[in-house]
Swiss-Prot record:
Keyword presence, Cytoplasm: yes
Record keywords, A-Z: Cytoplasm
UniProt cross-references to HAMAP family, sorted A to Z: RecX (MF_01114)
Record-level GO BP terms: regulation of DNA repair
Family note: Belongs to the RecX family.
Protein name according to UniProt: Regulatory protein RecX
Length: 267
């Protein structure tokens, strides 16, 4: 059976040691492994002893990777598992690492959800649904997802949504109905519910500048008319033009007035 003939501190890492058996380098181990097995010069190690040491050292290596990964920011159990799998840590060692991290508080899903909630409310314009999706993607338990999504909805100031809606409103062009639809769609994509969107939009002024709308309608009319005059003529051309402008959100009477003004359709 092999005997421990030397244990020396590694030159580049004072917390790791080189283990020599029968004058030959066997493996590197960390301080915890050294202490855990009470290794010292002269120890005789069986095959079973070596297997235990190797397994424990593999666990310690995985734990080192996990703690280093967790040092940059909060992580979920799923994220840590995936990180360790990329480094080819065995499933049994991963299970031990995760158990240790949960027990010692390195992984805390409630703390993760709370921190993400506060950060997103404070620094982003995203609504509760985007927050929910992020928690699900990170592997947070369903009960916590529902609990913290509800907290997100309660704590996000309606004023922030109103400011965002007003900002979006000023970015949208076109008739009133079209602008309303565009703002609602943008807010839905950012993760807000219909209820919150409707409440936030109650006091917004969607009435566009009349001169701006007149100019936009004139441009749309010319564009649509040129498109359809290649295929249609007469009454059919007029109806196709009106239908296209109605789909864009313009009022029927406004369209007819602009067409007459432009010399298109009925006089």
């Amino acid at each position: 059976m092999p005997k421990v003939t030397k244990i020396e501190v590694q030159k580049k890492n004072k917390e790791r040691f080189n283990l020599y058996l029968d004058e030959s380098f066997e493996m590197g181990i960390d301080m915890d492994t050294l202490v855990h097995f009470n290794l010292k010069k002269g120890d005789v190690l069986t095959a079973a002893n070596m297997e235990d040491i190797q397994k424990y050292e593999h666990f310690r290596f995985g734990l080192h990777l996990a703690i280093q990964y967790l040092s940059y920011r909060k992580r979920t159990e799923q994220e840590v598992v995936q990180h360790l799998q990329k480094h080819e840590i065995s499933e049994s060692a991963i299970a031990e690492v995760i158990d240790y991290c949960n027990r010692e508080g390195y992984i805390d899903h409630e703390d993760y959800a709370e921190s993400l909630k506060n950060t997103m409310i404070r620094t982003t314009d995203k609504g509760p649904e985007i927050f929910r999706q992020k928690l699900i993607k990170a592997g947070i338990e369903k009960s916590l997802v529902e609990n913290y999504t509800a907290k997100y909805e309660e704590e996000q100031p309606l004023e922030d949504v109103e400011i965002l809606a007003d900002k979006l409103l000023h970015q949208k062009k076109g008739p009133k109905k079209k602008r309303i639809d565009k703002v609602k769609q943008s807010l839905l994509q950012k993760g807000y519910s219909f209820e919150v969107i409707n409440e936030a939009m109650q006091n917004l002024d969607f009435e566009p500048d009349s001169e701006e709308i007149d100019l936009l309608l004139q441009r749309e009319l010319e564009k649509v008319f040129r498109k359809y005059e290649r295929k249609y003529e007469g009454r059919q051309l007029e109806m196709k033009t009106i239908e296209a402008l109605l789909r864009k959100g313009y009022e029927y009477d406004t369209i007819k007035d602009k067409m007459r003004e432009s010399g298109i359709g009925d006089e």
